[in-house]
Design a protein with these regions (language model features):
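Short, hydrophobic alpha-helical segments
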Residues: 61, 97, 258-262
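Short glycine/proline-enriched coil/turn segments at helix->beta-strand junctions
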Residues: 58-64, 90-92, 228-229
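Mid-domain catalytic core of redox enzymes
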Residues: 69-210
Length: 276
């Protein structure tokens, strides 16, 4: 019961879930009512899905630049007489007072390039990612034969040990998770062992989910040591449990820390984060 459920939550093979720190796992399961099999909490979903609140947040940002990938992040040299960060895009380079890198840790390291410091490389490099393939389709044949056995999450165990250890296979029955206006089953299959019928496939997507092993949990605890160094801050779902709420929480924490740093500058206090 426990390993398949955790594999579904974190989109990781059950073999990797065995390496998940026990204290962190129990704390999460207890907080979310997952340890008990019956009388679980009633979950709510956002009307319109996650894009609804993303759009609401974007509407409050006056100069949001979607579709403008950043190619590199360059810190202004401390001996230049000024401070800040340069962002390089296909449209050119632009200087900012500070930057919050809110992507995956390997993406942040790639953006920093040679300017990544040793402690940043050690911490960000400790977070590993699990590649997953998601297929959106309407082929109900991937679900259990008995319709009464259909669940919101349908875990499939592979008879091949190598496949079972490399990727988790599960089928999300979206009709059970979101109030869709269709009676026909709509599914998202993660790493399907048997391909859905071609005529039922509506999209394929590649994802990378953080793996929360002992090294990752230890890296999370060290995050304050690199925050704000050289005016670079970090945020993302990887800083906690890997969910949307964790990404939001870390973003708010980074914003509060930035505000405190700027308040200290306005008051004439030295910027502690610039010391290293």
């Amino acid at each position: 019961y426990l390993l398949p459920m955790l594999g579904c939550i974190w989109s990781c093979p059950t073999d990797q879930m065995l390496r998940f720190p026990v204290a962190t796992m129990i704390r999460f399961c207890h907080n979310h009512g997952l340890i008990r099999v019956s009388d679980r909490p009633q979950w709510h979903t956002v009307r319109g899905g996650s894009r609804a609140y993303v759009r609401r947040m974007l509407a409050t940002i006056p100069d949001a630049r979607a579709g403008t990938p950043v190619r590199a992040v360059r810190r202004v040299p401390p001996d230049s007489g000024s401070a800040g960060v340069w962002l390089d895009t296909d449209q050119g380079s632009e200087r900012f007072d500070a930057v919050v890198l809110a992507g995956h840790t390997d993406q942040s390291l790639a953006l920093l390039g040679d300017q990544a410091r040793a402690d940043e490389r050690a911490l960000l490099g400790a977070i590993r990612y699990q590649r997953n393939r998601a297929v959106l389709h309407t082929d109900a044949s991937v679900l259990p034969r008995r319709r009464k056995a259909w669940a919101a999450w349908n875990y499939v165990r592979s008879p091949e040990l190598a496949q079972e250890q490399s990727a988790v296979c599960l089928h999300y029955l979206i009709n059970r998770l979101q109030p869709l206006p269709w009676q026909r089953p709509v599914l998202v299959s993660l790493n399907p062992q048997a391909e859905p019928a071609a005529g039922t496939v509506h999209g394929e997507f590649a994802y990378e989910h953080p793996v929360f092993d002992q090294a990752a949990i230890a890296a999370q605890a060290r995050l304050p040591q690199i925050q704000g160094r050289g005016r670079v801050w970090y945020a993302g779902a990887w800083t906690r449990y890997g969910f949307h709420e964790d990404g939001l929480r870390s973003g708010l924490a980074a914003a509060d820390a930035l505000q405190a740093a700027w308040a200290a500058e306005d008051a004439g206090a030295p910027r502690a984060a610039e010391a290293a």
